Each structure stands twice: as C-alpha cells, then as structure tokens.
C-alpha cells in the first residue's frame, strides 16, 4: 500500500503500540519476544525439563497452548457456565514428552490456569502482554497453514479448492486482534463473512436486538478489514456495497465469492511475519541475548539469524522423513506456506517440495499414538539467504491493478516472473455480471484480462547473504520461466477439521 498515513506497521500492530519510530518498534518487538523466552524458561524449570526436552518442538507447542488457553477469557467463561464432564474449567494442560531409558514417554500434565497466568505476567514485567499471546497464535496459525489443507472448509462456504492460496490465517482465533487481522488472507476474511451471512439467513434474530447491533458492528469491521486488503478501486467499491447492505444475504455471498476469485489475479495485501516457537526465544534468552537492547523485527533478518543458531528437535514417527519434517517447520517459521516454491528453495538453499510429496504428518502427536517407536531428530531450520517479508501481494504495476501470482501469496520481497494460465482462472468468471455490482464486476474482469503473464513482480528485489544485515547487496535470483511452484499441487494433506 502506498498510503501508510494512518496505517500502523505490522510491528506496531504486533505490540499494540501507537505510531513509533523504527528503533522503538524494534525495542518493543524485542520486549515481546524476550517475554515469551523468559516465560518458556520458567515453564521448563517448573516442569523440570532437561535441556534436550526443552528444545523439543512438541513440548514447546504444549506450553504455548497452555498459556493461550489460560488467557482465553471467553472460553474460560463459557466453560464455567457450561461445566462438561471431566473438564476442569480452572485447569489447563497437555502432553509433555520426556526421555526415559532411551525412549520417549508421554506424560499428561495439568496446571491451574491462574498459576500459568502468574508465570506469564511475571515473565512480562507484570503485564498481560497480549502482543506476545497473539504472536504465539500466529505461529500456530502459520504451522496449520503449512500442515493442513482447507479444501473442505472452502467447499462448505461455496468457494473453490483452487482458492487455497487465499486461506492464510484461517485457523486464527477471532481474538487475535489487529496483528491477527493483518495476516489473514482474502479467502479467510471472505469465509468468515460468508459464515456470518449464512447464520443471518438461517436465524432471524441474528441481526436483531442489542446482540444484533454488536453483530452488525463486527460484520462491518470485518468488511473494512477485507476492503483494506484489496488494492484496486473496483474491488474496494464492491466491499462498500457488501458492507452497506441492509440485510446481507445471497447477493452478498455471491459478491464475496466473486471478490475472492478476483483476488487470485488482483492480489490482496496480506502481511507475513516470522513467528517462531517459544523454545527458540527461550534458548536465545537463556544464552544471554538481550532482545530489548538489540531490538528485533519479525520481517527482517532477525528470525533468520535466530534460527541459524538454534537447535530444535522434533519427535519423528517411524515412517516419516526428518528432512520433510524440517521443511514443514521451516515454512511455518517464515510464514511461507503460500510462497512460490522456487523462491523458498532459493532462500533456504535446499529444494522445497510440494506438500503432496512430503512423507510427514503434522508436528503434533495425537494422544492415542504409540510412543514406543518414536524417535527424535534435529530440525534443519537454517537458510542460505534471508529476504524481507512482504505484504504487497506481488502485483506488478503501480496502479495496483495487475497480475499477482495465481496459486501463490508471496511471503518474500524477491523478484519473480509470473507464469500463469489465465484462461483457467478467467473461465470462473463467465456469466453473471448483472445486478447492482455489475459495473464493478465488469471493471474487475477487465483488469484481470489485461494482466500480462510476462510481467515481473518485486522488480529488482533480491535476497541477501546472512552476513549482510543492512540489506545492502541484493542478489536477484533467476527462476525457470515456465513453472510456478505452488506448495499445494497434488495435495494429499489431512484436513484441518479432522
């Protein structure tokens, strides 16, 4: 976006801050991640985890989930009002994996939520540190984006599985605030809105009364978030129509699906942040690194540098490929599930393969899985180069009305060509251009038709050596012109909802 007048940068959203200069932002983001690190160290002490066990990503995820659950006020209230069998609303816990006699064993732990909140606040100078919580949510969301497919969720809302590259952040909780809204893809916002409209169609009281007023405010706010992601006037005008509709119904759903399709070529701006597992920040803090003094950024070299010197382990199931498990976590760490594989491979320095070819399941281990044959391995999370994260969507020209990459939502600000079959996309746009949004639809289709596949996105932008922290010498990679690499082709991943 050219106009950054009223917009806050991601880091400001991330730390809940008002407008700050670069140094202040780096300091407050540093404060946020060092709080996460201190909390993690304290939890490892409480649980008496060995150094090795503390570096196990599955243990990190359990500890992260416990603190997120401890601060989930809405759910806590709900659990207290609707007591369910065998669930203590005041407790939280999960599986902790320990090394015993050369084997991994699972131990289920339970803690008072109050106690977890106390440890978290203590690690964060007595504050609630919601920014740190959101940061953990985004890391979990990025991990889900890399691990699961959302075909079923797309189909349920009347969208098309080919729109999977628009679904970033689809598993983020509603309470993830401005930082969460920034990383949600166009498809995710469309899906949330469609679900809302469908409830309104089925439930007459949804928009009525005092609750209905709050619902309406939430609806308009979500519309505005989505509108802010679009970069062309016609797409935004259509969002105004959807937002101002007196009684949102099927016409609005149609408009939203049309907009989601159009975003395959006229890309929305979606933020990308490298959010790492808590254990990585813990390791750095334990080794004496002062994040607040040094400053930290989620979109620059810092996360790459952190991963360069962190050793993280993962449990591996008997027939899984450790290299593939590493790729999954690497993609999650850099929010690169929707990036062009050619770009990811270049930055990582090893070939990144499509999800359909991965011999690995998710990182988390289900409670009914047998631990006997579980092994553990070091995750290879290092990279050959680093690159700046983007939120532009990769449209090519300055009028913002040009081609982005079809099955890709770019993560890195790195020059790439746009190989795409426009005919396959345009086929989805035959037919309906009547109704009150007809002129906007016509305009959007015109812009899409004039998109040229030979264009280049992020012209002149390159990757940087890890020694080049000031980003002075961009290395512009040249990619094989004719194949765009989507992670999702030939997909056989598990569904998120299972």
Curated annotation (Swiss-Prot):
A motif (Bipartite nuclear localization signal) lies at residues 198-216. The keyword RNA-binding applies. GO terms for biological process: symbiont entry into host cell; viral penetration into host nucleus. It is found in: Virion; Host nucleus. Pfam families: Flu_NP. A motif (Unconventional nuclear localization signal) lies at residues 1-18. Keywords: Capsid protein, Helical capsid protein, Host nucleus, Host-virus interaction, Ribonucleoprotein, RNA-binding, Viral nucleoprotein, Viral penetration into host nucleus, Virion, Virus entry into host cell. It comes from the Viruses. Residues 1-21 are annotated as: Disordered. Belongs to the influenza viruses nucleoprotein family. Homomultimerizes to form the nucleocapsid. May bind host exportin-1/XPO1. Binds to viral genomic RNA. Protein-RNA contacts are mediated by a combination of electrostatic interactions between positively charged residues and the phosphate backbone and planar interactions between aromatic side chains and bases. This is Nucleoprotein.
